[in-house]
Regions:
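Histidine-acidic metal/acid-base catalytic patches
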Residues: 23, 34, 78, 82-96, ...
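Active-site acidic/histidine proton-transfer and metal-coordination neighborhood
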Residues: 4, 8-94, 102-105, 114
Length: 196
């Protein structure tokens, strides 16, 4: 896989979202990430395995980027993650899914600010506004939804964010590439404006 990725000019920097309560599986996950020369794994460690996960992170030189799936995930809000990693290595941090925060009634700007310097990667997106009678807010083309993509990018710039963006677009499954291209175009335009 690494050879094929390299042949195509692609560098695989991370994997996930990894979830397991089996300590041996965590060792194998870190081994895989190390063998593939990845920088981080995206995961949701059980609260009672943090000592092992931190130890494996140090052993293999792999960062841990914790995803915030909606409730009942232990990490659905930033305070929970910050409590779990308090006093631990700076290589343990957040894979901030900005859409899930909003879907849970949290303000994504506040969450990004709260996690200052502990964000390793992002599942970045824009989502449709809440609609009466609908529980789920669909992913939409960046800049057309309710998340203030440009504002989030400004917060990340203020924080000196140096991690990774994963474009997460879980909509229009049969023809999503044109929508993703529009997301990239919006990102480039917004980033250019912010950097002026």
């Amino acid at each position: 896989l690494c050879a094929e990725a390299a042949r195509r000019g692609v560098r695989i920097v991370g994997t996930g979202v990894y979830v397991s309560d089996n300590p041996q599986e965590w060792e194998r996950m870190f081994q895989l990430a190390h063998e593939m020369k990845m920088e981080y794994i995206t995961c949701e460690p059980p609260l009672d395995l943090w000592d092992q996960v931190e130890s494996l992170s140090r052993k293999y030189g792999i960062k841990v980027s914790v995803h915030n799936h909606p409730q009942p995930s232990d990490y659905w809000k930033p305070e929970n993650l910050l409590e779990a990693i308090k006093g631990r290595s700076r290589d343990l941090g957040s894979c901030s899914d900005v859409g899930h925060w909003n879907r849970e009634g949290l303000q994504q700007m506040d969450c990004l600010r709260m996690l200052n310097k502990r964000i390793i990667s992002l599942h970045f997106k824009d989502i449709a506004p809440k609609q009466e009678g609908k529980q789920w807010q669909e992913d939409v083309i960046w800049g057309t939804g309710c998340l203030d993509v440009k504002g989030m990018l400004s917060v990340l710039k203020e924080q000196g964010f140096k991690g990774y963006f994963a474009i997460e677009y879980e909509n229009n499954w049969d023809n999503s590439v044109p929508d993703i291209v529009k997301c990239i175009e919006y990102f480039n335009q917004a980033a250019e404006e912010i950097l002026r």
